[in-house]
Amino acid sequence: MPHLLHVDSSLATESSTSRSIATIFAEAWREAHPDGIITYRDLSVTPPPHLDWATVSARFTPPEQLSAEQAEAVKKGEELIAEVEAADEYLLSVPMYNYAVPSTFKAWIDQIIVMGRTVRQAPDDSALTGKKVTVVTAQGGSYGPGTPKEGWDHQQPYVAHILAALGATDIEFIRVEMTLAPVNPALAEFIDLFQRSKAEAAAAARLRASV
């Protein structure tokens, strides 16, 4: 049966744009796959541990030679890796923080990337090979061509490259821009742009979830 892994990373709850669009996707996915499974992980509630040397060194040590510290470190990330390996579709909700991704999302990525396991030399044999990935992003401003901060987006390019390293090729980004417009008077002229962007993202999420 279809199995969706839904990962949220916004620190906000009710006011989060990325969460709201991801919820629309998840609800539409449930309607399209009534017998499907959704595994949900909220990185703001249960932040993954940042990498330490015990974890890194353990990945290059035979299991029977692991120290107690290494074994404990590996155990912390094993649940996250198992969730990725069990799913066949992914919904990642990733707001932009300081022009990049939340630190909890980066920590999650660092935990699930394991050379020789989730990332393999053969491009068609990694954890996300042949699987569908939808990434919902929310950005306080706009960073496209011709904007004052063109080139400042270190969020989407990073996520795209990481997913490619994990073997994903069926990737769609659903982005909402100018999320700060309703709360920052200096950006008030862009409220209509934000509302239009959010409506388009909601429609894109419903469509993507249903196919």
From Swiss-Prot:
Cofactor, free-text remark: Binds 1 FMN per subunit.
Keyword Oxidoreductase: yes
Keywords: Flavoprotein, FMN, NAD, Oxidoreductase
Co-factor(s): FMN
Single GO term (MF): FMN binding
Domain of life: Bacteria
Binding residues for FMN: S10, S16, T17, S18
Catalytic activity: 2 a quinone + NADH + H(+) = 2 a 1,4-benzosemiquinone + NAD(+); N,N-dimethyl-1,4-phenylenediamine + anthranilate + 2 NAD(+) = 2-(4-dimethylaminophenyl)diazenylbenzoate + 2 NADH + 2 H(+)
Enzyme Commission code: 1.6.5.-, 1.7.1.17
A Pfam family reported for this protein in Swiss-Prot or TrEMBL: Flavodoxin_2
Keyword tRNA-binding: no
Transmembrane segments: none
Family: Belongs to the azoreductase type 1 family.
Quaternary structure annotation from Swiss-Prot or TrEMBL: Homodimer.
Stated role: Quinone reductase that provides resistance to thiol-specific stress caused by electrophilic quinones.
Protein name: FMN-dependent NADH:quinone oxidoreductase
Lineage of the organism: Bacteria, Bacillati, Actinomycetota, Actinomycetes, Frankiales
